[in-house]
From Swiss-Prot:
Cofactor: Mg(2+)
Main location: cytoplasm
Record's function text: Transfers the 4'-phosphopantetheine moiety from coenzyme A to a Ser of acyl-carrier-protein.
Positions that bind Mg(2+): 9, 58
A molecular function (GO) term: magnesium ion binding
EC number: 2.7.8.7
Assigned protein family: Belongs to the P-Pant transferase superfamily. AcpS family.
Biological process, per Gene Ontology: fatty acid biosynthetic process
Catalytic activity: apo-[ACP] + CoA = holo-[ACP] + adenosine 3',5'-bisphosphate + H(+)
Protein name in UniProt: Holo-[acyl-carrier-protein] synthase
């Protein structure tokens, strides 16, 4: 396997909190997949949950070398946890088509958060 891309992002949690206070759930609707949305609505720390998902999706877009444009959308990158709790990525729509075109066979996700920040790194392999 070969590394196709690496992306990292850091999010200030207070910034996400301010956006939610200003515009309600609009950011969450734009960023989260349907499955993530269902979790977010009942999560005990919704701001932190959204900040971490946003960081992973930004990191993934950077790893793919595209950013969020040309038909790609945040909600096409879905973050979920495997049976051991490890964060993973599931792709939908244009993100899935791009991964298939690039020959992506594996995606690695790491996620960390502290009081003020959430950060994520994504590595994609062919």
């Amino acid at each position: 396997m070969a590394i196709l891309g690496l992306g990292t992002d850091i999010v200030e949690i207070a910034r996400i909190e301010a956006v939610i206070a200003r515009s309600g759930d609009r950011l969450a609707r734009r960023v989260l997949s349907d499955n993530e949305w269902a979790i977010w609505k009942t999560h005990h720390q919704p701001v932190r949950f959204l900040a971490k998902r946003f960081a992973v999706k930004e990191a993934a877009a950077k790893a793919f070398g595209t950013g969020i444009r040309n038909g790609l959308a945040f909600n096409q990158f879905e973050v979920f946890n495997d049976e051991l709790g490890k964060p993973r990525l599931r792709l939908w729509g244009e993100a899935l088509k791009l991964a298939e075109k690039l020959g992506v066979v594996n995606m690695h996700v790491t996620l960390a958060d502290e009081r003020h920040y959430a950060c994520a790194t994504v590595i994609i392999e062919s």
